[in-house]
Amino acid sequence: MGLIGYLIYFNTIKSDDFINSPYNTRQDTFADRVVRGKIMSSDGEVLAQTKVSEDGTEERSYPYNNVFAHVVGYDSNGKSGLESEANFQLLSSHEFFLNQIRNEFMGTKNTGDTVVSTLNADLQTTAYNSLGDRRGAVVALEPSTGKILALVSKPDFDPNTISENWDTLVNDETNSSLLNRATMGQYPPGSTFKVVTALDYFRTRGSFNGFSFDCQGSITKENHTIQCYNGKVHGTEDFYTAFANSCNCAFAEIGTELGGASLLKTSEDLLFNKKLPLTSYRKSSFTLNGSSGIPLIMQTAIGQGNTLVSPMHMALITSAIANDGLLMKPYLIDKVTNAGGDTIRTTEPTDYKRLMTSNEAALLGKLMEGVVQNGTASALNGRGYTVAGKTGSAEYDENGSSHSWFIGYSNVDKPDLVVAIIVEGGGTGSEAAVPIAADLFDAYYFD
């Protein structure tokens, strides 16, 4: 390709999908002419950059090491994360046109554009440190825009040494460190699914008023028994109290009244078995239907059974609740600038889909406020901000071991931060996930 033709093609004709394709052989040509651009956090921290030595050798560097491993990704042995999603922008150069011509004649590479992400370095670091050495994932979103503020998955890896450790990482099936658990992990939702069951109940009955259930600590139907946590007897409950108590018996009863077909319809309205507005993800799975038996319906209604969901999907459902029922399309690229700091393009928030009515979202929000004020997430009460949320304990083996879940949002009158957290093998939601949520909310409002 001639010089002028190359510059015209590179600056006007190329498309994101084409240049990001692994089958596009022109990527090597672009890399020959452009020093790969930086990836920055929204608060001005360098997340990825290319260092060029005196002899022209280039080395991709990740100053935060493991902290942004999955979401920023890597640029060798293939690409992942933002390195893949933003490949087009990072290999673009919007230096002054005549400078590009001069650089071409002098054999000097152009400087690639800078991708400014939506990620907040302080919030990401807080999430990373709070999860600690435990397996799991943390997602933080801005519900009114869809900005992804933090995304952590563990076990992780150091992208600075990805090439040296590649074979070990690929073959380590025990840790699966390359797997982004936030978007690709599949977990039983546990009691966080009671948000879905509650929505289906409201759509079927038209109101939570008039509901009453006498919890005796266990419920048996067709020789299948469901117990509340530790067999706790909650006594007489209305709907709000049953939700705040995370009463398995009440919600197992509700599930049998609703039936599999109704729960399937509402679940698919919330994007189970459906495409998600993400670049890389695994579909959440909901298998209940009209022919499902009572025991499976009971299990499914409380978030067990065969249902599997990713932390990001639960964050999206929570985001819709926090945003009057409207899900905004999640995104990671806030803007792209040239080497001189001039803005080339910005991402405007866009509606993705209305998952529920504004009234339904408000009612679910009230249920979730009760969990914090009077229920299983009371540790988040009285911390200088308001929170609505739902804990979950998702059993995953025959020994009754549980993953710890929390989904929720803060500043309930005008929500500005949504979180979804899972700690593998962490026990109850209040034990492991809620303290991480507290760290995130504290960092967001007070740091």
Question: Which residues fall in each region the model found?
Answer:
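Beta-lactam-recognizing serine transpeptidase/beta-lactamase-like catalytic domain environment
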Residues: 42-43, 144-191, 196-425
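Periplasmic/cell-envelope proteins involved in peptidoglycan metabolism and beta-lactam response
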Residues: 1-166, 177, 186, 211, ...
